[in-house]
């Protein structure tokens, strides 16, 4: 489970990352752009994006909708950090959704690798080590849960 300091860092950074719909849409597109640049083959899982450019991911209905959906899921996690049963249920739901798409736990590891750069970009040039560590702890929890579901 997440430590109190991590919960605090997640909650405070989330207020900036998900300030409003436009911020969410921009940050979602940024996150997936970084993922696709560092791990180009991950784009194969997102056929609904087609050959969309980074700019199009920020401006088209499909791109904006995906950002909103992903950030809604993350927001549910942030809102449930003090409810272990709910967190486990959300992680299970996330795992099942990704297993259906044949997205394994190693792909969650790729997202973990991209996330520090995303935080630097989305939080205006430098997320603290505490913030990066907190997000890594949350993503590690999701990755570990994903591995357990695949067994």
From Swiss-Prot:
InterPro entries: Erythrocruorin (IPR002336), Globin (IPR000971), Globin-like_sf (IPR009050), Globin/Proto (IPR012292), Mb-like_M (IPR044399)
Coiled-coil region: none
GO cellular component term, pick one: hemoglobin complex
Alphabetized PROSITE patterns for the sequence: GLOBIN
Residues annotated for heme b binding in this entry: 66, 98
Oligomeric and partner information: Homodimer.
PANTHER family: GLOBIN-LIKE PROTEIN
The protein's name in its UniProt record: Globin
Annotated organism of origin: Cerithidea rhizophorarum (Water snail)
